[in-house]
Regions:
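Aromatic-enriched alpha-helical interface/lid elements that frame and gate functional surfaces
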Residues: 198-234
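N-terminal helix-loop segment corresponding to the beta1-alpha1 unit
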Residues: 2-143, 147-156
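Residues that act as N-cap/strand-start positions at coil-to-secondary-structure junctions
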Residues: 21-22, 196-198
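Oxidoreductase and adenylate-handling cofactor-binding alpha/beta cores
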Residues: 137-157, 170, 174-182, 225-232
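Short Pro/Gly-enriched beta-strand edge/turn motifs at strand-loop
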Residues: 9-12, 180-187
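Short Gly/Pro-enriched turn/cap motifs at secondary-structure boundaries
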Residues: 186-194, 201, 213
């Protein structure tokens, strides 16, 4: 919506106006036009289909099976816009034994393996909450752009089945490859990064409570020593 696209978002309830509006609503709906539609009613569905006929991309994140029941599945949309692109976001994808299980960020954060690897060795798995939702939304946007490029080349639209669980798994690719290669299950390790040091957030002795330091080679280590007035450590 910030890149010259016209975005219309169907709302469940009428948004609050003025100072009572949620800051989160303003954040996630920046530059988007809202429309209140009851698509369970024929007249609401008809309005939606008229919008689809004028659109390039439709993105939805209903629970699997809902769009089919409402008559707004991909097969329905191509009847009014043959080259439409539809991106469906769900917790576990539209096929498979767990496809009907709904989920929010805390659920697919765990299912994707990220929660298990986030935190300290002596602590519980940690949620990163909204960051997971944003990653899934970003993946949906990139999928839509790739589909638009494909349509530009071929003239064909397409349906994209996006699993939030799989998107989360892309964040732990190194851990997945390690397990596949060695059979070892990676463990939580706080902010520690095994290939670089110092590379962490450290407590301070002065007024600043914390400092973030990232050193990746000998040249950066020497520069850090000079900055700390500890040249003898170089």
């Amino acid at each position: 919506s910030s890149a010259a696209s016209d975005v219309y978002k169907r709302q469940v309830d009428r948004p609050e106006l003025g100072l009572d509006r949620s800051p989160r609503f303003n954040e996630v709906n920046l530059n988007k036009a809202s429309i209140l539609l009851n698509i369970a009613r024929p007249e609401g569905r008809d309005v939606l289909l008229r919008l689809v006929a004028l659109s390039d991309v439709v993105i939805e994140n209903f629970r699997p099976g809902v769009v089919e029941r409402l008559g707004i599945a991909y097969d329905d949309l191509v009847k009014v816009k043959p080259d439409i692109i539809m991106v469906s976001i769900s917790s576990n994808g539209r096929r498979g034994p767990e496809s009907e299980h709904p989920g929010y960020a805390s659920v697919f954060n765990a299912l994707g393996g990220l929660g298990y690897l986030t935190g300290y060795p002596d602590g519980p798995p940690t949620e990163i909450r909204d960051s997971v939702d944003l990653r899934v939304g970003t993946a949906a946007a990139f999928a839509a752009m790739a589909a638009l490029l494909h349509r530009q080349r071929t003239g064909k639209g397409q349906y994209v089945d996006l699993s939030a669980r799989e998107v989360v798994s892309t964040l732990i690719g190194e851990a997945l490859v390690e397990f596949a290669a060695t059979g070892r299950i990676p463990q939580r390790d706080g902010n520690h990064l095994g290939v670089y040091a110092p590379y962490d957030v450290y407590p301070c002795a002065g007024e600043d409570e914390w400092v973030a330091i990232a050193v990746t080679d000998d040249q950066e280590w020497a520069a850090l020593c000079c900055a700390m007035g500890q040249e003898w450590l170089r």
